[in-house]
């Protein structure tokens, strides 16, 4: 039998992902299962839950994954099709040692991959590279495992509702629901983008006592309406239109596997991830003053300032869901978030990124406030900033460019933060350039205290990109 070898490009920093039948094959799923099972055996673990998203290749990959896990002697619980946070939830709810999600997240429809987690810590970086080494060494365990189908959808929805301040709809009334009824009935628009969160979103909306408008709830591997990535403004155009036309209090969107959230206020403005984090942080810090809150390197200075003003300890961290979770565990942070809409609640929750739970928490904030979400947005200190700018770049070149940029800035005597890429701070603002760990892109962002200073920062960033022979994106022209 020929020794299996993964394509080098699929073993990423936070997960395994590639293009189905180009760099990622059914055989890879089998050997992901064999190697992960070996890892678990070496660490005295044997119970694992597995789920998949709605991509056309996901059931095929999941079948091979489960086959390998069972043949390696593991107790496998198949929780079916759903969002990534439902899989994370199942690990805790079903008392598993680990979980694997088959998902392409928000990547194009022909992509797919695997997100792995351990109950007691994230699984990433060297752990993922270690799977490749186990496969190379053919260090596998054979055994007679088991497989059981377990439906956790209703339990997951119940868990979401347990922290929702809105009463449940009449078909699910509790004895004391009258005491929970809101002062006004909210109107909420939802957009699953035909991703894996659609069924959960539908079930949840039926049980929250509010008026709901659902967009693209059917799970469809072709994403026929728009791509499920709420960080891209054009993907929120349908949601914005519904919010404005129907007079909604807010609109909520999810990415392809439901671990990220996008939010639109009642005036149709996008609430970016770092703005959303201000609202979450203020709420939590009322009850937990002095708590540590983490934001990624792409976040606005406003967020770090507002955390401090509210009595918290702000901490800047590297972008990446696994890196953030590891930093939360290390610092005992109660909340963390990324510009991309990954929000991690350790306050009242498990500490993993869950776009659906984040939706419940922003609904609570809007419901309990005497101000609209638009009013809350306008009250934030105003800066001039670009959105997250993605510049296409090859896997091989993107990290080289960041290193070249660092060397050039050092020679020029420019100080910068290199916690994750390059973030310069002029006192009037900052710009960032980092290599994405999940896509073949460079990520840039600029923020300043005025339009004039923003333009100066964009000019400076353009010059640095030109030095590295990077094509200047339209957003920086």
Language-model regions: role of each:
Residues 42-111, 204-264:
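N-terminal small/polar loop signature for handling phosphorylated ligands or for N-terminal nucleophile
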Residues 250, 288-477:
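Phosphate-binding and adjacent anionic-ligand microenvironments
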Residues 112-246:
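Gly/Ser/Thr-enriched, mixed-charge loops and adjacent short helices
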Residues 110-133, 264-279, 349-360, 366:
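A short, gly/pro- and small-residue-rich
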Residues 129-162, 174, 181, 266-339, ...:
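Proline/glycine-rich low-complexity loops and linkers
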Residues 45-53, 187-189, 291-297, 334:
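Short glycine-rich phosphate-binding loop at a beta-alpha junction
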Residues 1-67, 71-72, 146-185:
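An N-terminal, well-structured beta->alpha segment
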């Amino acid at each position: 039998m020929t020794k299996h070898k993964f394509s080098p490009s699929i073993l990423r920093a936070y997960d395994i992902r590639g293009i189905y039948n180009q760099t990622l094959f059914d055989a890879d799923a089998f050997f992901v299962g064999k190697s992960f099972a070996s890892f678990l055996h070496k660490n005295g673990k044997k119970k694992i839950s597995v789920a998949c998203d709605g991509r056309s290749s996901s059931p095929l990959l999941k079948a091979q994954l489960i086959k390998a896990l069972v043949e390696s002697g593991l107790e496998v619980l198949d929780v079916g099709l759903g969002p990534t946070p439902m899989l994370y939830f199942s690990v805790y709810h079903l008392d598993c040692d680990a979980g694997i999600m088959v998902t392409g997240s928000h990547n194009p429809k022909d992509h797919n991959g695997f997100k792995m987690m351990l109950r007691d810590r994230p699984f990433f970086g060297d752990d993922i590279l270690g799977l490749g080494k186990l496969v190379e060494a053919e260090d596998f365990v054979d055994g007679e495992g088991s497989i059981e189908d377990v439906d956790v959808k209703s339990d997951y929805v119940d868990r979401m509702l347990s922290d929702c301040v809105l009463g449940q709809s009449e078909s699910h009334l509790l004895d004391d629901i009258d005491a929970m009824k809101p002062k006004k009935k909210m109107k909420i628009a939802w957009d699953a983008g035909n991703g894996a969160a659609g069924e959960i979103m539908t079930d949840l909306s039926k049980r929250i006592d509010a008026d709901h408008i659902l967009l693209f709830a059917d799970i469809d591997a072709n994403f026929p309406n728009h791509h499920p990535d709420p960080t891209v403004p054009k993907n929120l155009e349908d949601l914005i239109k519904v919010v404005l036309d129907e007079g909604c209090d807010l609109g909520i969107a999810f990415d392809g596997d439901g671990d990220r959230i996008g939010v639109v206020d009642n005036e149709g403005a996008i609430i970016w991830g770092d703005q959303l984090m201000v609202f979450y942080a203020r709420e939590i810090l009322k009850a937990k003053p002095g708590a540590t809150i983490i934001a990624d390197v792409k976040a606005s200075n406003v967020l770090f300032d507002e955390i401090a003003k509210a009595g918290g300890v702000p901490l800047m961290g590297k972008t990446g869901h696994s890196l953030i979770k590891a930093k939360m565990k290390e610092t005992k942070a109660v909340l963390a978030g990324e510009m991309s809409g990954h929000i991690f609640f350790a306050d009242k929750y498990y500490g993993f990124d869950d776009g659906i739970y984040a939706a419940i928490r922003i609904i609570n904030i809007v419901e309990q406030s005497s101000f609209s979400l638009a009013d809350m947005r306008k009250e934030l200190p105003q800066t001039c900033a670009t959105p997250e700018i993605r510049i296409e770049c090859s896997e091989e070149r993107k990290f080289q460019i960041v290193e070249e940029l660092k060397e050039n800035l050092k020679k020029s005597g420019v100080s910068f933060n290199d916690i994750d890429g390059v973030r310069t701070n002029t006192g009037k603002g900052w710009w960032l350039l980092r290599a994405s760990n999940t896509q073949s892109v460079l990520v840039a962002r600029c923020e300043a205290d005025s339009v004039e200073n923003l333009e100066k920062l964009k000019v400076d960033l353009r010059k640095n990109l030109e030095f590295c022979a990077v094509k200047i994106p339209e957003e920086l022209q």
